[in-house]
Amino acid sequence: MARKVIALAFLLLLTISLSKSNAARVIKYNGGGSGGGGGGGGGGGGGGNGSGSGSGYGYGYGKAGGQSGGGQGSGGGGGGGGGGGNGSGSGSGYGYGYGQGNGGAQGQGSGGGGGGGGGGGGGGSGQGSGSGYGYGYGKGGGGGGGGGGGGGGGGGGSGYVGKHE
């Protein structure tokens, strides 16, 4: 008799435990974070110079069958000068994403940094730079990917792309 009672109690506990785990499986959570920062610098008249910079960071997390976990960051800056002035700008961005679950969950991160430099009138020059970094991670049947970044310059200046992974 005691064995039957113990067996029934064990069976009941097993049933409760399985129902809880199934309930947890159907929970869907989509998490995404984004961070953006931008800085701008104004120029000056005559022989004035202007510069600006910006940066951003983003983080996202998705769990238990959720389809999205992604973070993205972006930053940009610009400056300009009138007359014989110079302008420069730079930006950077970082993104991180993490996805965990069984329903094709995926994590993706993208960091796009755009730096724009405004030029100057007359003999002025413009310069811009940007960098971006992306990281993605997927667990439990999902995959992750990472994005990149870019930069540009204007006003007769130059631009380049920094870190791009």
Swiss-Prot record:
Residues 1-23 form the signal peptide. It comes from Oryza sativa subsp. indica. One of its GO terms (cellular component) is extracellular region. Keywords: Cell wall, Cell wall biogenesis/degradation, Repeat, Secreted, Signal. This is Putative glycine-rich cell wall structural protein 1. Its main location: secreted. Responsible for plasticity of the cell wall. R repeats lie at residues 56-62, 93-99, 132-138. Residues 105-125, 146-165 are annotated as: Disordered. It comes from the Eukaryota. GO terms for biological process: cell wall organization. The keyword Transport does not apply. The lineage of its organism: Eukaryota, Viridiplantae, Streptophyta, Embryophyta, Tracheophyta. It is found in: Secreted, Cell wall.
